[in-house]
Every structure is written in structure tokens, then in C-alpha cells.
Amino acid sequence: MNQNLSITASLLGDPGRAAMLLRLMGGIALPAGELAVTANVAPQTASEHLAKLVEGRLLSVERQGRHRYYRLASVEVADAVEALLVLTAHPRTAGLGSASSKAIVGSLEHARTCYGHLAGWLGVRITESLEKRGLIKEYGAKAYSLTASGREWFETIGVGVPSSAIAQKKLARRCLDWTERRHHLAGRLGCAMYKRFRELRWVVPVRDSRVIRVSVEGRAQLWKLLRVPLG
């Protein structure tokens, strides 16, 4: 077990590999070429990094024609990366000098995706509002339970929750946000909510980024339904 921990730690400790993992936290699959650009390494070096991450079970790979697409191997990997981010220095104190870098960090802090669900300030505020209204409740250290009124609320916005899914532990998970240091809603319910917000065009993902923009309609609806202040 100690040896496995040491191997995983060494995989995460390389800046290039860490950059690749962070790029894939949005729950997407990307080809080696894009991940090489993300890590700022040569294609051959990227291939070596990716092979190690696949061997270490941090990434999975799928072949489509001539290309290979890489994604995080599991939600547990995403949780581990998020947990490590919580332990690292806050991005505002990490020595980011350029105005563009600071703008990107600010956008990520405000609203971003985390393996298919909403994170950052927006994700945390939505979660806190759901709790305050009794729509979800803490269920142990790692989960939320969906209340009867919560199930009705989600159905009103178009997120159906089958009775068989309510008791499942992975329906609504608590994910510690690395920028807010508080929990946001993850799991199948968190992913379904984000997907529905996208369908309604309340939130719009920024191309080639984990950053999320909230539309004018989204601002109005999130205030109306959850009293989330977005200006």
C-alpha cells in the first residue's frame, strides 16, 4: 500500500502531468496533442507522461481512428486532485504575475466545472442555498440526502430523480471546493443539475476552459429560485 501511495504521489508531483490532470477536471476527453500544449511539453514527452498516468490508473484512454483520447479514470481520481488542490497554496498567492493569468484564476474561482458539476463561488452558493431551503441535507461527511421537497424542486426545473436513485450514496456527494474551502454539490445530482442549467442556457461553458459564464436569464432565474446574488 505504501509503495502504491509513493507511485501515485510521484505521478502527481510532476508539473507537466499535474497540468494534464487539471485540464481534464472538466470531465472531458482530449487528444495527446492538446494535452501536450496544456503541459507545455514536446509531443514525445507528453506521450511518455500519458502512458505513465494510464499505467497508474489515473487516466483512461480510448482510441478513435488514428487518435487516442484521454480522460480521468474515475470520479475518485477527480476527488483526489481536488483534495490536493485544497492543500496547496491559494492561487491568488501563487505568484501569478500577468493580468491575463489573474483574470483566468478569478474566473475559475467564480464559476467552473469540476468533473461534470458546478464548482467555485457559484457552485458553493447554489449548494448552500439548496441546504438553507431544506432541499438537500448533510448525510455523513461525504454525502447529501435529497429531501422530498428537494425532489419536487429539481423536478420543477426538469431534473427527474427516480425513487430507486434517492437512496444511492453516489446520488449527491459533498465535494470540498479548493478555492472556497467549503463544499459544493457533486455526484449524479450535481452533474444532472449542471447539465440542465446548460440546456436552459442559464450557464455557458467557455470554449477550451473549465470556466463557466452565467447568462442574463441564468442570473435572473438563480436569484428567483435560490436567491443567489449575481449582480
Describe each PLM feature range.
Residues 54-64, 71, 139-140, 206-207:
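Beta-hairpin "wing" of winged helix-turn-helix
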Residues 62-88, 146, 150-153, 218:
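Basic, amphipathic "hinge/linker" alpha-helix immediately C-terminal to the N-terminal HTH DNA-binding motif
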Residues 3-42, 68-70, 105, 113-114:
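N-terminal helix-turn-helix DNA-binding core of bacterial DNA-binding proteins
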Residues 3, 26, 79-139, 157-207, ...:
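Amphipathic alpha-helical dimerization/coiled-coil segments
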Residues 217-231:
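Short terminal or interdomain "cap/linker" segment that borders an active site or interface and mediates
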